[in-house]
């Protein structure tokens, strides 16, 4: 959680979404959403934290952990702007490496956004004429 808090403080919210996942392996009765809210308040965690659901058919690994092939906690997953898992770490990862990888993904997303904006501007600047050609009909 301290590293996630540093990421949230370092990168702009429009560039990087920080989301926590509360996983429960034991003492389920004590690990309620209410106790999680108290923990987040006490430790001043200011990013969303989801509560993982129990494993399917009593499996010991919670559902989201299974879906993302997480080996345990802590796990850190970097997902790019297209929704593709690009990096995943089990255990600690250095802030320097993580910062460089996040910056790389932000730069890729910004470049993709710029290319999309340029393409839209080019399409808008081309005159639209009504009629049909080999490609189809415009209105």
Task: List where the protein language model places each region.
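Non-globular targeting/processing and membrane-anchoring segments
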Residues: 100-139
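Sec/Tat-exported extracytoplasmic proteins
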Residues: 8-11, 15, 43, 93, ...
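Short coil/turn linker and secondary-structure boundary residues
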Residues: 30-34, 93, 137
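Thiol/disulfide oxidoreductase modules built on the thioredoxin-like
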Residues: 43-45, 51-103
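Structural microenvironment flanking redox-active thiols in thiol-disulfide oxidoreductases
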Residues: 1-43, 54-64
């Amino acid at each position: 959680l301290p590293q996630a808090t540093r990421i949230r403080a370092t990168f702009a919210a429009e560039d990087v979404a920080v989301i926590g996942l509360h996983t429960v392996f034991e003492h389920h009765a004590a690990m309620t959403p209410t106790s999680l809210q108290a923990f987040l308040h006490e430790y001043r965690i200011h990013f969303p934290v989801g509560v993982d659901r129990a494993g399917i058919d009593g499996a010991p690994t919670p559902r989201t952990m299974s879906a993302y092939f997480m080996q345990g906690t802590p796990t850190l997953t970097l997902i790019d702007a297209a929704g593709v898992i690009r990096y995943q770490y089990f255990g600690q990862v250095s802030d320097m490496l993580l910062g460089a990888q996040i910056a790389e993904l932000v730069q890729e997303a910004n470049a993709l956004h710029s290319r999309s904006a340029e393409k839209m501007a080019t399409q808008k600047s081309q005159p639209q004429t009504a009629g049909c050609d080999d490609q189809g009909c415009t209105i």
